[in-house]
Amino acid sequence: PTISTLKELKKSGYKTESIKDELKRNLTQVLKAGKKTFEKIHGYENSVIPQLERAILAGHNINFLGLRGQAKTRLARQMVNLLDEWIPVIKGSEINDDPISPISSKGKEIIKNLGDKTEIDWIHRNERFYEKLATPDVSVADLIGDLDPIKAASLKLSYSDERVIHFGMIPRANRCIFVVNELPDLQARIQVSLFSILEEKEIQIRGFKLRIPLDIQFVFTANPEDYTNRGSIVTPLKDRIGSQILTHYPLSINIAKKITKQESNISPDDKKNILIPEVAKDLVEQINFIARSSEYVDAKSGISTRTVSYTHLR
């Protein structure tokens, strides 16, 4: 984009839009055009994908509930394709402030000082995807942020002042898609912090509350069986996740073979030298299907669809 100042942006007719409305608008256009919304996802055409489309149209935060290897994260990543290619942000903003309606004190200060001369940066949709694997050692500082005592002392500011906060991943993902994988593994107190962001539009750091209306599309993933024995989703947070979508393994061997063929990474030279009979491919996939119903395999942790190793055998 050639627009570089706030004045030019206003002249272009740009209007502020939430990320959920942006996703909804672009998804509606894709559906009207009869195009495929999620590419290279097999076996979900009549189950998971329609539910995901409805969740996006409803403006919900989403939780994918399923076992390992069921394309939960891949679906979340492909939601990026439903974002606008470029969005404007205030140059120098830490949390991707919208030039028309900034939410951070720094963004507001820049607009106040420079007015229409405020410089504009542009962010590509591929940069608007954040992902965090939830583990028990993830802290509030990692996700939400922490107070910077050195900054507070040097600027002579109170700890309750927004300017002394070093923002974590979630505030920096403002106007982006934020994925939390394995949500139940997050400590309960951090899940409560997420609840505050979803419900109250405020962040809490070391007892200080700060109201910042963050604009984020949250996507969570979780396993239906708590095979990690580490925790669960706290009820208040669960109630604020608008759509819970159950994923599943391929329902037929043909779909499983299609996934394996797509995911296997075989060089052109190897393809010339190696021939894998169809019956061998069927047998490998059949082993997966049998394992999922076998009493000798712990089905709670899932039998992944990632059976691509046989394609590399010599």
Spans of model-derived segments:
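Conserved small/polar residues in nucleotide/adenosyl-binding loops
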Residues: 311-312
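Short functional linear motifs
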Residues: 49, 191, 238, 271, ...
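Conserved C-terminal "switch" segment of AAA+ ATPases
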Residues: 16-24, 230, 244-303
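Conserved ASCE/P-loop NTPase catalytic core
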Residues: 1-252
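Structural motif
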Residues: 43-44, 300-307
